[in-house]
């Protein structure tokens, strides 16, 4: 046959993944739903004193993109929170107006165009499709005709599909079938592309700010409302997309995202798996000290972080007044 032993094993597991995910492109898997439940559960457990500390603040506002995966994420996250904190009242909202800032796409989508061109240029000079094909196929002469001549496109599609396996209920990481060198080159191509498409790249110096601004304005306004003395808001939650979250954290300049890098500088200095994996989230957690100051700390993917450009007030905490001024000035 045309398949080597590695090719047969890859094809076997790929078939299971394809059958499981038939008709579900872009949807949340059961594994993803479980992870969102866990994030909500951990938030409730970690900040139980905050949720229980004010008997008048009982409303949890939940806003989601209209995307089905975001709606299910919202449901599962709040299920986890409910199991930890009793007595809260949940308000669920979605709609086109909310999608507009939770998944903002400027036209033309310059980030996708520029990053895609950079990725394919890298692949044509650095990637090793022949090694990958020889690993999976006993004969490779037919591949160029089969894919219309673009072997780099075919290699990219194989890699992208292999990345999906570990996200499914089957849970098999198909990348383990890749030889080391082609695996590394494929990761480098995609990793640098993510940065150029959505972060503080030198190629697109204003893109992150352009995408993040509508969402950041909403965040500031909703925090201001929640912090009013007569507010009943215990938490205000948004469920959106990585294509907006990554520009947001880049524009804000949290640790690990504030550098401005070119496509060629990204690998070795930044890892997409650390900053924009499935279920990525940013949390602003508010406190009031004995002097009445409103303090806030930032968590990214449930770990405390900071903004190197803005000095904290004490430990991981900012005065909200200072952080608010910084954020407002960044979009003014």
Model-based region annotation:
Residues 1-61, 65-236, 240-332:
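Signature for phosphate-centric chemistry
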